[in-house]
């Protein structure tokens, strides 16, 4: 999958050093894989779920469910743009923000 930028992963690894290994592993798995559908990606990331407040945004749990990765994924083109890698508490705040903003 074409992960548009590694920067969100590097930033998250610095911000959450206890989960840096899991963050970097997630990046490598995503970058090396080819996923033409959510079902294919879900085989490697069973936690994959759609983010109901934005079209084509998806959520993946990272680091034993310590963090959440929010990304725009275009399966047709096999590309991903990571929007956020954050804790569950911050994820809850983002949900409220996007829910209020609408699509």
Task: Tell me what each language-model feature is.
Residues 1-66, 74-81, 88-103:
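Basic, Lys/Arg-enriched alpha-helical interface segments
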């Amino acid at each position: 999958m074409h992960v548009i930028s590694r920067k969100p992963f590097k930033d998250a690894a610095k911000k959450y050093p206890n989960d840096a290994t899991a963050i970097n592993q997630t990046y490598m798995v995503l970058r090396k894989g080819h996923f033409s559908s959510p079902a294919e990606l879900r085989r490697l990331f069973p936690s994959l779920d759609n983010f109901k407040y934005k079209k084509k945004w998806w959520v993946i749990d990272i680091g034993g469910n310590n963090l959440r990765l929010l990304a725009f994924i275009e399966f047709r083109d096999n590309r991903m743009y990571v929007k956020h890698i954050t804790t569950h508490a911050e994820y809850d705040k983002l949900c409220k923000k996007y829910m209020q903003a609408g699509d």
